[in-house]
Amino acid sequence: MDQKNFSKPLSLAKVQVTDAFWKKEMELVRTEVIPYQWNALNDNVPGAAPSFCMRNYRRAGEVEKERKAKGDKFVQIKYPLDTFETLPKDGKMDGRFYGFLFQDTDFTKWVEAVAYSLTQHPDPELEKTADEAIEAVCAAQREDGYLDTYYLINDQDMIFTNLKDNHELYCFGHLTEGAVAYYQATGKDRLLKAAERFADFIASKLGHGEGKKAGYPGHEIAEMALMRLYDLTGEQKYLDLAKYFIDERGTKPYYYDIERGLTCPEGEERYSYNQANRPVRQQDEVQGHSVRAVYLYSGMADVARATQDESLLKTCETLWNNMVHQKMYVTGGIGATHIGEAFSFNYDLPNDTAYAETCASIGLVFFARRMLEIQAKAEYADVMELALYNGVLSGMALDGKSFFYVNPLEVLPEACHKDERKFHVKPIRQKWFGCACCPPNLARTVSSVASYAYTENDTTLFVHLYMGGTVEGEKVKASITSEFPWDGHVSVTCESDTKEPYTFAFRIPGWCASYEKEIPKGAEVEEKDGYLYVTKVWAKGETIRLNFPMEIQFLASNPLIREDAGRVAVKRGPVVYCMEEADNGKNLHLTKLCVNGEKTAEAADELGEHFVRVTAEGRRMKLGDAEKQPLYHLYQKEEEEKTKLKLIPYYMWNNRGEGEMQVWIRACE
């Protein structure tokens, strides 16, 4: 593993986004999504599923206050731990925990989004709200560092007795990520100290050694959270704990058997749902719950980089290749089945029952960025870009007030309402979810999108994503002008002199067949792994100009993807397109796209959004008096009529009411 290839993300404080596209999304999160979600966390959104999140923190704080006051005389009122979700009965609540057992993370993801927003746009009132909420959270923490309201409220004697199912280490992970981000944004360490104390508690209870359990997370995220804590503090113990979780995972005897009193017959492998069916370095196929998987792989990449573990990196590369070449949707969505919110078998990518959870695409972005930190390869950045513009942004309405958990590639509303096999596919975005992992996850990702655009090392500034703004690296400052994702022209101006040769490395998008470049005189130019490296002693004001033409592309799938045979998907630049009923009428399944016909891309403004609409020649089968026709009849050539198909960006679908939608369209010559 060559450390010369390593790079690290720039601090968000060193990147200012002025980009027309992403600045708008970030402002939407700041002005609409963050306040809306704060109301949701406090159960103040009419018609939305309750969160109970802040109520649980306050209730846990009351329990801790009573425990401290009574000391040895404290006797906890205990409640059952046998439900994944607890709801009030007949609208009446008692002192128990309510919601999903991981409900704490609604807040910790929200506060992470707040932190990133404050970095770009200081807001004293928002910071005050976050500070007060942090006090409520920290008031619930035990003196020994434990902080998970599900057990603090219900039964503290049962802590760490069901790591597989009950998400304690998942809650720790999101607490830590939020705490690190908030400290970096504000300099305030109240939540950070709480996260460190919780991490120390975990290290004292889990691992190898007398009195410890050889356990590891059921839902991964603690691994990459510990690595963020390690990167911030330099404390070796956090790297050691992350490495332990990864190394121990999937070893036999299975810890999950031990903690639940089960045995595993010789030769049997299970727990693939948790990516714990075998040691991670022996895994060669992405399996199980898709979000858990990419969170684990992100942590593995972090540990591989920090420890220069070649075997772990090789595993990451193997799993990456299986995922993006055999199990990823054209939108950057992952996880094909609602059963277990999981990956299916290779090339099984159904469109109308797709799961493609918003959180899973976000996790894919995390994984891609971490692989880029080890070595800049355009494939990683291409997938990161694909997921961000499509599989991630589709999870949020244009007004920021409703959300998709699941992101299908084909929707017939009647089927969503009447076919139980598609109960998970919603034809309209929801105000909130009882299991609300996706909305705050999306908010924190959009707020921090600049951290995925650039990485740097001692010699090079890497530009992975193109967005307008300013960048202040350790050795160079630059301003970037970009109209992505609608136009491929990019200019990068050096805003400082360099005393020594320095390199800018620009990703050459995989969707671009050829590109144009205008390079200052005297520069050394090299292409490597899909990046254009430009090296020279820079003078302030020197500019690099690039143009990546965005042609309308009709994509075909691998022939082993059964559902997409004979169909095409439309893509322009990084943006995937879809047909909607609002533009093309009902019965979209009767339409065909003429791949050799005329096609146009035109700027449009609708629903407050500037975008590029694609129009293509098509044909539509005449429906006739179909309801009076026999169910089956002898084949005869279909009667068709010419039509113009109008397509919009996939992330924009379902912002004009309920209706049909298709990404993959039947093709004709």
Model-predicted segments: where are they?
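Catalytic-core region of carbohydrate-active enzymes that cleave or remodel glycosidic bonds
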Residues: 305-326, 349-401, 412
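Hydrophobic core segments within long, regular secondary-structure runs in both alpha-
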Residues: 19, 26, 38, 111, ...
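C-terminal beta-rich recognition modules with glycine/proline-rich loops and embedded aromatic residues
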Residues: 14, 242, 316, 382-390, ...
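A conserved hydrophobic secondary-structure block that centers on an alpha-helix together
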Residues: 154-232
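Low-complexity, Ser/Thr/Pro/Gly-enriched N-terminal "stalk/linker" regions
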Residues: 1-106, 131-151
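Well-ordered alpha-helical scaffold segments within catalytic/enzyme domains
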Residues: 22, 111-124, 173-188, 222-235, ...
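Beta-strand-rich binding/interaction modules
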Residues: 499-520
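Solvent-exposed loop and edge beta-strand segments that line ligand/cofactor-binding
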Residues: 3, 70, 89-107, 158-171, ...
